Regions:
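Short catalytic/ligand-binding loop motif for oxyanion handling, primarily in non-cytosolic enzymes
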Residues: 9-13, 65-66, 119-121, 155-156, ...
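Conserved, mostly hydrophobic/aromatic
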Residues: 16, 47, 56, 80, ...
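An N-terminally biased module of ancient metal coordination in phosphate/nucleic-acid-related enzymes
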Residues: 1-11, 202
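Catalytic pocket-lining loop regions of alpha/beta-barrel enzymes
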Residues: 54, 67-182, 230
Length: 231
């Protein structure tokens, strides 16, 4: 999936749309929306009608002024449900808001980005990267919430294959079930911390996953939740 990067393009998905036009069988598209826009619900509806679109996104980690009760947040969630597309939530530092959004919108498929945990862009890796894990685990109580296991390797304080990530990840797998866990590398953010190959191989070489668990985590759950797979 190709998520239009907020850090580079804010709410403009032009580049992601250009990439999709060149490689229409390779990518599904997700873009962030500004809850402060008066017509944001209509924006989501129009976005959902574009070929290749599979989701929307709310950037609570960077737009923390928006509460769960904000009209724009509600509009995005309602529009996502009406269009049948998931809404991704980047919510590190705002897990309480994510909990309330999930409670208020049980009919909207919600995806927690980046494990719900703040992750580094460059070394050194901070200690205590999984300190807020219990708050993340609490989100599993909502059936409409799934979680992306993106960037997990960037929270490791060990070298490849990052042996210290598996204890916290196993808690997530138990809480959510593999059918609600979506693997990803987040490599474009993590280029200063690991290679793309390392981000993939860490999940392929581990004996912490069965064949069936690995297949669900590394594609099966994503295809089911987003209704998309590469052409």
């Amino acid at each position: 999936l190709l998520i239009s990067p907020y850090s580079m393009y804010r709410y403009d998905a032009s580049y992601a749309l250009e990439v999709f036009a060149n490689y229409p069988t390779r990518f599904g598209l997700i873009k962030p929306f500004n809850p402060g826009d008066a017509d944001v619900g209509d924006q989501v509806s129009r976005w959902a009608d574009i070929p290749g679109v599979v989701g929307a996104r709310i950037m609570l980690a960077y737009e923390s002024q928006f509460s769960a009760d904000h009209g724009g947040v509600k509009a995005i969630m309602h529009a996502g449900a009406a269009a049948g597309i998931p809404v991704n939530i980047l919510c590190w530092g705002n897990l309480d808001k994510a909990q309330e959004i999930a409670r208020q919108h049980p009919n909207t498929q919600m995806i927690i980005d980046h494990l719900g945990l703040k992750q580094p862009f460059e070394p050194p890796v901070p200690t205590g990267g999984f300190d807020n894990l219990e708050q993340v685990l609490a989100l599993a109580a909502h059936d409409n919430v799934a979680i992306k296991i993106t960037g997990a390797c960037t929270l490791s304080t060990k070298p490849f294959p990052y042996a210290d990530i598996w204890s916290p990840l196993e808690k997530l797998f138990t809480a959510f079930g593999f059918e609600r866990c979506l693997w990803g590398t987040d490599w474009t953010r993590a280029t200063c911390l690991l290679t793309y190959r390392q981000a993939v191989e860490a999940f392929r070489v581990t004996d912490s996953l069965s064949v069936a668990e690995r297949e669900m985590l590394m594609g099966g759950a994503l295809s089911a939740i987003y209704g998309w797979s590469p052409g």
